[in-house]
């Protein structure tokens, strides 16, 4: 036991360690895997069509949040048409917080503030129609 403690204190794993320590270190290294996306051939148009259809048919809060999670999991930012359908779905299921958080997701996905402001400007009429206030406007 003292040998194991000494090894952990020095930060080195060596042959002096017991078999359980070597097994644990090997087990941890073996579980490190790089996982890649399997959607290599999916185009932007296919994603937009898929999520436009999905959000236009959402009927409950769980489906809406699941769809948003899946939509934002891609390496691309959804188009403004998809965001508009998601906002309409959020108001349809009476989920105001999710409607506000959709814009937070867009802000995180976009690399610059100018791009975010372009999304906000394009979706401003929809926000006014649905009564959605952005987080920036709530905390002024």
Curated annotation (Swiss-Prot):
Q: Which GO terms describe its molecular function?
A: metal ion binding
Q: What's an example GO BP annotation here? A: proton transmembrane transport
Q: In which pathway does it act?
A: Energy metabolism; oxidative phosphorylation
- Tell me which Gene3D superfamilies the record gives: Cytochrome c oxidase, subunit Va/VI
- Matching InterPro entries: Cyt_c_oxidase_su5A/6, Cyt_c_oxidase_su5A/6_sf
Q: Keywords assigned by UniProt?
A: Heme, Iron, Membrane, Metal-binding, Mitochondrion, Mitochondrion inner membrane, Transit peptide
Q: What does this protein do?
A: Component of the cytochrome c oxidase, the last enzyme in the mitochondrial electron transport chain which drives oxidative phosphorylation. The respiratory chain contains 3 multisubunit complexes succinate dehydrogenase (complex II, CII), ubiquinol-cytochrome c oxidoreductase (cytochrome b-c1 complex, complex III, CIII) and cytochrome c oxidase (complex IV, CIV), that cooperate to transfer electrons derived from NADH and succinate to molecular oxygen, creating an electrochemical gradient over the inner membrane that drives transmembrane transport and the ATP synthase.
The name on file for this protein is: Cytochrome c oxidase subunit 6, mitochondrial
């Amino acid at each position: 036991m003292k040998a194991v403690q000494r090894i952990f204190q020095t930060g080195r794993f060596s042959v002096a360690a017991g078999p359980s320590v070597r097994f644990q270190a090997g087990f941890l290294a073996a579980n490190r895997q790089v996982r890649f996306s399997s959607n290599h051939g999916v185009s932007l148009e296919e994603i937009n069509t898929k999520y436009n259809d999905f959000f236009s048919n959402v009927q409950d809060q769980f489906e809406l949040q699941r769809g948003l999670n899946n939509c934002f999991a891609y390496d691309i930012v959804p188009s403004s048409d998809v965001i508009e359908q998601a906002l309409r779905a959020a108001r349809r299921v009476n989920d105001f917080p999710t409607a506000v958080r959709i814009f937070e997701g867009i802000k995180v996905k976009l690399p610059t503030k100018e791009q975010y402001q372009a999304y906000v400007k394009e979706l401003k009429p929809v926000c006014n129609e649905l009564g959605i206030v952005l987080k920036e406007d709530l905390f002024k």
